[in-house]
Amino acid sequence: MAHSVKVYDTCIGCTQCVRACPCDVLEMVPRDGCKAGQIASAPRTEDCIGCKRCETACPTDFLSVRVYLGGETTRSMGLTY
């Protein structure tokens, strides 16, 4: 099941999210103006299972990578309030 994965400009290029993803959804790409010279990218969102391990691994206070779950997935994971 595909989910929307967004990488924000606050990404510091640490690769933690890429290494945490069990489905190889994320990869690092070159980025000018970034201190690390690279930033995370999500070219394979159709493979995202919504586990949010990438979010958990992100060391920034801004959660530079976010996974947005669809309504059905949110309900099935018991995340509705």
Swiss-Prot record:
Apoprotein for the two 4Fe-4S centers FA and FB of photosystem I (PSI); essential for photochemical activity. FB is the terminal electron acceptor of PSI, donating electrons to ferredoxin. The C-terminus interacts with PsaA/B/D and helps assemble the protein into the PSI complex. Required for binding of PsaD and PsaE to PSI. PSI is a plastocyanin/cytochrome c6-ferredoxin oxidoreductase, converting photonic excitation into a charge separation, which transfers an electron from the donor P700 chlorophyll pair to the spectroscopically characterized acceptors A0, A1, FX, FA and FB in turn. Binds 2 [4Fe-4S] clusters. Cluster 2 is most probably the spectroscopically characterized electron acceptor FA and cluster 1 is most probably FB. This is Photosystem I iron-sulfur center. It is found in: Plastid, Chloroplast thylakoid membrane. It is an enzyme of class 1 (oxidoreductase). Its cofactor is [4Fe-4S] cluster. Signal peptide: none annotated. It comes from Antithamnion sp. Gene3D superfamilies: 3.30.70.20. GO terms for molecular function: 4 iron, 4 sulfur cluster binding; electron transfer activity; metal ion binding; oxidoreductase activity. It is a peripheral membrane protein. Residues 2-31, 39-68 form the 4Fe-4S ferredoxin-type domain. [4Fe-4S] cluster 1 binds at residues 11, 14, 17, 58. Pfam families: Fer4_7. GO terms for biological process: photosynthetic electron transport in photosystem I. GO terms for cellular component: chloroplast thylakoid membrane; photosystem I. Its EC number is 1.97.1.12. Its main location: plastid.
